[in-house]
């Protein structure tokens, strides 16, 4: 399953979040990072592939003290086309 994770960092947590991200010690708990994009204003989005929501939750728990997130299951074009089949 694919999951879109929108994230934002509160101004008071920017330094610590940047240090944690720069450390390279991020654990994906069996999830596969498809892509991550950063935008001005301390916001961004990730696409992660995972077999279950538990893995996503474990991944997010390492950031929940610094980052606000929303997680949405998503599908690619092939999945969207399958959903249109009767």
In which residue ranges do the predicted regions lie?
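Conserved, structured core segments of small domains
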Residues: 1-86
């Amino acid at each position: 399953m694919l999951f879109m994770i929108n994230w934002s960092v509160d101004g008071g947590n920017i330094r610590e979040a940047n240090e944690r991200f720069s450390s390279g010690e991020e654990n994906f708990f069996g999830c596969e990072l498809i892509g991550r994009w950063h935008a001005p204003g301390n916001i961004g989005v990730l696409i992660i592939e995972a077999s279950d929501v538990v893995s996503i939750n474990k991944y997010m728990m390492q950031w929940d003290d610094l980052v606000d997130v929303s997680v949405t299951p998503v599908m690619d074009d092939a999945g969207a086309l399958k959903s249109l089949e009767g």
